[in-house]
């Protein structure tokens, strides 16, 4: 972007100014418009922004008066003038008086402009809009409110009138109708007038339009306008992604129609009895009698009939019922695939992952479990790929916007930056001078204290954003010195010094931290029910902590004086905490008044001593301040949506409530009032919208509900995703080691002193037991040594030589804390005593993060080689490894050194020269060769897979398959023997030390132990539980496959540094859990009617005592909710369900119904408890999620940089394939098919390769997809016949295409995979159509023929055939596939392990809630289905709810399970909680990295310059266009035709107009007559497309030599100039002419004036004319540059 020239003065807009603008408009008609094409508006001078500082203060007479525009873009091109208000805000108006626009000098317009730009006018409109917005959210308003609404309407009409007069109706971009916001304002006002004063007021839609008035807040705030414009740019960038999403949505919807049309109507209908006359025709037919609801089979507590299917893996009906297609679809008929509309809604539901488990179960019941593959594919494409795509585009847009803002702030208005810098320097100098004067006036005794105060104050200011401080009056300074800086008697000074020593001592901070932690622990101990002893203990502890905090505050005030104390923000925070806690003691009778405030403050107080917490909070605060406009826009949108929904659907929810509930009682989720409408919108934005949409369609119809919900979902998610991207980007710069505050340093110092004291005591004890040399002891006792040995172990302390060596190192360097790697380098390695040769194990680089491989020297620069304890002829000898090699996990094996294993034998060991030594050596060499043989490794890998796979066979039916059970028992023993043998071989080959120093071998050893324990468990019945650990055998897969090793290493390296951030997030959750316990402990109990299973109404049972007095109370109906806040642990689990939006609705319902402890809940009694969950979702879920993901991305980028920019989740071999694939995809080189020499075949070749032919085929595919869209279930026979003939026509057309291509391409046809696919589609389609006609049976259903034809729709994604934007969006996925596949393998292994564990522990759990016939843990397939749901964070609350059944009232522990010896159907709550929580955390971590891989791959595409290789066809098309511009074959073209020639070329050589600036910048040689040679143009255009490097230079030389061969008679010429020089000459001539004209104008003005006094305004006009000339001159130069 071009910068504006030096700022000129503010010139009033006069008649002469208007004449100049009119003359300029007349001149522009005769000049070349491209001379001003490069002139762009300055972003610092945009309308709505403040005038920059370099323009100085506003002179008198310039405020609210028309001024000449200071931006050359608007002055030269847009013909505008500007107006400034008192706040220096820029307003721009059109100066041309056309289309009912008054002159800028008209008094009426000037008065309107003054009113429009006045801040009070803007404030009046803002207050009116806010008042109107508040009134709109209220219901049942009194009559006098109508007068206020009429007044507000009058204000809006007056505003429109003022704007029309000031701006004109339609005269340029700054007219009234030139602003879209004015269109909205005018429309809303017009409709409001119609509804207020016309008979049309009864129309609901006209009344609803008034709610758009809320959006009027946006144009009143420039920041909101900027955010809206940014989001509009994001939508432009997202256009391709939205189109791709709609394409996939349509394709999968059609696929769903073909697979599941009509299936959801299959229900279990009662079989007619023998005495009934009705008969059943067939299993899929209909009964002769009309089925009623009573005839269907319903599960206990189910609302809809049980679905079934006729496949063996589908749902089965109980005895006495048959599966028939009758009735309506489930969910009130809104869930189906019977037509394209409902199928599209179902696919959109899966795309947003809203309640997908219900749809899974419905489809699997009706169609079969095999269709779970369809949902896995849908989840990958929609929930993963498209989400990553949207996030990637938003991230790229945000990064570009941030980069542009940085460039503007760094490059624009340097004078402004210099002015600000000078002002800052003056302020600093004045403050320093004032400080020196104050110091001179003070007494010497107070200087030290004041310095401490200043030091603390400075420290506090460093932790806060710097703000400008205003100078205070002298009297105020005297008052401060007298009242807030205490100078009393010497006793007070001593007390001051004592308090200062106490509060600054490191142990004081450690003591405070311990007290805060204990205070938090005391808060976390509260639970329900709680004994009186514990309650009193917690109360006393709370009083003690309050006393400690109060003493701390008093000591700090004494030590620092009140003035210094309150200069630090943390001290102010501490004082507030103390005041609130003292208030809590005084108001102890008011329950929960101050607790909810003090509890968060205590947690925040702990964060004072944690640098990660402070850093994260600082980043969060700065980010939210920078994003305040975006947050405000999101709040406005939510408010608008709630009000709009309330106005649109409120009456329908009241009048048609009986359509939802049979008892006609109000629902929890509706839009009858603002609060419920707001919560409904909030629930929609949280991703749960389908259930409320069903209810909305029941009461208000589909026509309004679906558009409203789509608006809220799409716009709301766009705002949330953009906010998410910006916050994640901010946290990606987090560095925990960047700063350590004073309190943290004190804690480190205190811990170091404690460790030093403990070590000194240990040294004394050891010195009494051993005789330590005096010199060594003296050196150890040196303070520098004591300070740095605190982190060493007892074995290190016993090594005196280590201390001596460390003493020498520490004396030559600064006293810095010893890092872990440095401390390990100080440990003396044991001497090698093995005399026999051994083989080294795998490279230590594979030991995850084994830090024994190398150590850093004291200077930290060089790496030392570790001394090998042993070696072998067949061993892999580790060499010195660089950091880069370690990061990519590449290592080399050095060649065998003949004497590498020769070591001196120590006493008592086997000698190498002895006979036994040689035998042992040969045995070890043989074992080494065996274990390192590739065939042996493949055999072990195969055995590992077989061993892991057999675990899937041990389901609940294993006892019924006796043979399989026996085979598995023998297989377990065989596998155990093989792995034991392998371990023994490695022990012999590598030795124990090398074996157990490798973490992967440790894992193998653990698996062997698991094998042994499981085999032992089978021998005795009392040891049978040991067999349940067999699932750990699958962990051996990790050590056998390099891909999983790479992924696991990368996960560890990207996750471990986030531990501090994870702890911060955990503390936030602990805070919310403690608050939840304070709010809801013991309040979720309710009295249940055992006959109905529902809660008693509150007017029948009010509390626990009344419930227990009921006569039929035999089963204790006073029950607690399974998810509650009775203690911190339950609170964590409840918050996890809220965070995953699973089961959170029931938790919120219990919370808002809660009345009190031992009180019966009442419907929506505590409605405002919704705020607790809203705050948690924002501050406990959204923001911590941004923190974690941002830090993970930072670590991901760090590891990626260390590996040279390559992907960290792929192996070395895959990296080579990745580079090759990347070059292939970016090069976009396609091997052309040779054109046949036969004329007929050549004609067909030209036909099928023509673009029009490809377009026709794409249109045919789209038409064929349209024929599927118009179909529906139970359509008429005429429709069936029409569709059959349309399918036949499409098959014939596609067959004709296949024949034409076969004839044209010949054998080359089958070299393309796309052609092979088309050929197979044609064959299957013909077969599907002809078989029914020949044999009369449909072996291939007609719907399947349509789906086969539909598969051709993927041609739209074909590179070069479909839209290019689709190809660009698919590139990241293709490039990221290797990494995604590796990560998928790891997550599949995790799912496999957890599925086996679930089969062992939850196979016999009672089928209830989320566990049913389809989703259970009985078999491996069902377990994987359950875990797939949990992986997408859906449905795990229902499974956990079923596992919670562990009491006699909920399950039967003695139930006999047929076919097995296991009894009972109870679950284990503790095991279930651990199972699901651990799996959610692990799977979330892996999935987040999958998202990051794909997003980073997408972001890397624009950062790399796409160097495209031009093909022969590109050059052929170039010369084809050249022939049109050079028909005489002169090899030259006139320079005036160059622009048209560049615009006529085909991509990638194509250059769109305006392109003169780009062509001039190419600096093309020109011959006589302003002609340019063909070769020069070709070479320049090729270089523009392919870039500049050595490879391109070679290609250019080849092009030039090829051109010379093809044109041997090239005309030689000498270029006389270039395009750039010629343009510079023309611009220079124009500048000279304009300068001369300006000079002549000034001379004429001097001659005309007869008096020496010249009108000031005329001088301004003259300077304006000269400056305007300069602006135009600079604009012309900048245009060409």
From Swiss-Prot:
Compartments, record wording: Cell membrane
GO biological process: cellular homeostasis; osmosensory signaling pathway; response to bacterium; sodium ion homeostasis
CDD domains from the UniProt entry: Na_channel_gate (cd13433)
Keywords: Cell membrane, Disulfide bond, Glycoprotein, Membrane, Phosphoprotein, Repeat, Transmembrane, Transmembrane helix
Entry GO CC: glial cell projection; plasma membrane; voltage-gated sodium channel complex
Intramembrane stretches (start-end): 340-367, 674-700, 1128-1154, 1421-1444
Chain positions of IV repeats: 1233-1531
Composition bias type Polar residues, residue spans: 806-834
Principal localisation: membrane
Chain spans, region Disordered: 806-875, 1647-1681
Segments on the Extracellular side according to the record's topology features: 139-142, 198-201, 261-339, 368, 523-531, 588-593, 656-673, 701, 954-961, 1021, 1081-1127, 1155-1167, 1273-1276, 1339-1341, 1403-1420, 1445-1468
GO MF term list: osmolarity-sensing monoatomic cation channel activity; sodium channel activity; transmembrane transporter binding; voltage-gated sodium channel activity
Tissues and organs where the protein is expressed, per its UniProt entry: Not tissue specific but widely expressed. Expressed in regions of the central nervous system that control body fluid ionic balance.
Family: Belongs to the sodium channel (TC 1.A.1.10) family. SCN7A subfamily.
Described function: Sodium leak channel functioning as an osmosensor regulating sodium ion levels in various tissues and organs. While most sodium channels are voltage-gated, SCN7A is not and lets sodium flow through membrane along its concentration gradient. In glial cells of the central nervous system, senses body-fluid sodium levels and controls salt intake behavior as well as voluntary water intake through activation of nearby neurons to maintain appropriate sodium levels in the body. By mediating sodium influx into keratinocytes, also plays a role in skin barrier homeostasis.
PANTHER family the UniProt entry points to: SODIUM CHANNEL PROTEIN, VOLTAGE-GATED CATION CHANNEL CALCIUM AND SODIUM
Free-text comment on this protein's domains from its UniProt entry: The sequence contains 4 internal repeats, each with 5 hydrophobic segments (S1, S2, S3, S5, S6) and one positively charged segment (S4). Segments S4 are probably the voltage-sensors and are characterized by a series of positively charged amino acids at every third position.
Protein name: Sodium channel protein type 7 subunit alpha
Protein encoded by which gene: Scn7a
